[in-house]
Swiss-Prot record:
Coiled coil: none annotated. Keywords: Cell membrane, Membrane, Transmembrane, Transmembrane helix. It is found in: Cell membrane. One of its GO terms (cellular component) is plasma membrane. It is a multi-pass membrane protein. This is SPbeta prophage-derived uncharacterized protein YopE. It comes from the Bacteria. The chain crosses the membrane at residues 5-25, 60-80.
Length: 83
């Protein structure tokens, strides 16, 4: 049971750091990103959910916390495919 607790702490910690990096280091989250997300989503309910979700930075950080290690794993696999 303690192993599960360690895993969840690591999962959420890596997700938090990835979200902070996405917003403050990469500076991807700006008006252009919001417009792109608005264009990429379909009309109707999906567009409303996307605009609601990406309305502020805390929602984006929470999203990255929940997906945890997935962005890190995707970046590592992309590096291996390139090299």
């Amino acid at each position: 049971m303690i192993g599960l607790a360690y895993f969840l702490i690591i999962w959420l910690g890596v997700g938090l750091l990835t979200g902070i990096k996405f917003i403050f280091v990469d500076q991807v989250y700006d008006e252009e990103f919001k417009e792109l997300m608005d264009k990429e989503t379909a009309a109707g309910m999906e567009r409303n959910l996307a605009s609601l979700f990406f309305k502020n930075k805390l929602n984006v950080i929470a999203f990255f916390m929940l997906i945890g290690l997935l962005p890190l794993a995707m970046r590592i696999t992309k590096l291996f495919k390139r090299g």
